Regions:
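DNA-contacting interfaces and partner/effector-binding or oligomerization modules
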Residues: 1-3
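Compact, glycine-rich, soluble single-domain proteins
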Residues: 5-100, 105
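Acidic/glycine-rich phosphate/pyrophosphate-binding loops and surrounding catalytic core
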Residues: 89-146
Length: 146
């Protein structure tokens, strides 16, 4: 089986560096699935979850790894994927209560209909909170199927 090297980094540092059988990422136009020997690609990322299926020799199957990115850039080469994220974290480090509170706060700001800049900021915060909550739901569903 082929493998592809994956590197996920943010301004804070490296989050993941390893080999994968498959990677899924939230590109601007929708989720993309990337396998080894994928055609070169450069695209923006929107807030959401990155799923990495680790490469394992033989017929063994490893648990998927989940990461949250707040946006950034995805570069794909046939044998390497680089994700340069604005903010990135392991999904296990996400705080569901904090994300829910951020979602509520952003919705309240949108209801106030303040300036265009404040509306854009609230929309970005709402998108980030919704993406975190969606990723947490995916992880819960994945845990139930194991």
């Amino acid at each position: 089986m082929n493998k592809i090297h994956v590197n996920i980094v943010s301004a804070e540092g490296e989050i993941f560096d390893g080999d994968a059988a498959m990677v899924f990422a939230p590109a601007q136009m929708g989720e993309v699935g990337i396998a080894p020997n994928h055609a070169p690609l450069l695209t923006g990322l929107k807030p959401g979850g990155v799923r990495v299926q680790p490469f394992v020799e033989g017929n063994e199957k490893a648990d998927e790894l989940f990461f949250y990115v707040s946006g950034g850039v995805l570069e794909v080469q046939p044998k390497k994927i680089t994700i340069l994220a604005d903010t990135a974290m392991r999904a296990k480090d996400l705080d569901g209560a904090a994300a829910e509170e951020a979602r509520r706060r952003a919705e309240d700001l949108l209801k106030e209909r303040t300036s265009a800049v404040e509306v854009a900021t609230a929309q970005a915060e709402l998108a980030a909170a919704a993406a975190q909550l969606h990723l947490l739901e995916k992880i819960k569903k994945a845990a139930k199927t194991r």
